[in-house]
């Protein structure tokens, strides 16, 4: 949308630089100004709609991160590729409310899903006896949001994490 606005400004600049020989009444200039104003209004509406959805989603799950599933069942490497192609990430809850939002998706689908735990994580939600490196190098969350060590070859629910930078 910003590209369209910039294009409109560029056309307006070119028109002004070339003079008014081809548009002595200013109709073309007025038309460009009207089109630019229309694009600005549309951009403001889209931005407002986006922010409304963002705020509603954040309010609804208590997290500014959005956890979404495509309902596929895949292993860790396939999940990584799917999330990357979708513009998201493998879930990595950093706070309790983020883990709860993630767990809500798992509970709704009655499935487990992979997550990534950073080395410097301030928040963890390991189940009793975990982490258990013997169980595998990956981590999964159960439907209650508890974390368990698991094999990276297990086929689990595909859930990707998306977050907004405002």
Curated annotation (Swiss-Prot):
Disulfide bonds: 83-160, 138-152
Record carries keyword Disulfide bond: yes
Subunit structure: Homotrimer; non-covalently linked.
SUPFAM superfamilies: C-type lectin-like
Domain of life (superkingdom): Eukaryota
Compartments in which it is found: Secreted
Listed name of the protein: Phospholipase A2 inhibitor
GO molecular function: carbohydrate binding; phospholipase A2 inhibitor activity
Glycosylation sites: 61, 122
Keyword Glycoprotein: yes
Function: This phospholipase A2 inhibitor binds directly phospholipase A2 in the presence or absence of calcium.
Keywords: Calcium, Disulfide bond, Glycoprotein, Lectin, Phospholipase A2 inhibitor, Secreted, Signal
Record GO cellular component, one term: extracellular region
Residues annotated as signal peptide: 1-19
Family: Belongs to the alpha-type phospholipase A2 inhibitor family.
InterPro entries (UniProt xref): C-type_lectin-like, C-type_lectin-like/link_sf, C-type_lectin_CS, CTDL_fold
Domain C-type lectin: 46-161
Tissue expression profile of the protein: Expressed by the liver.
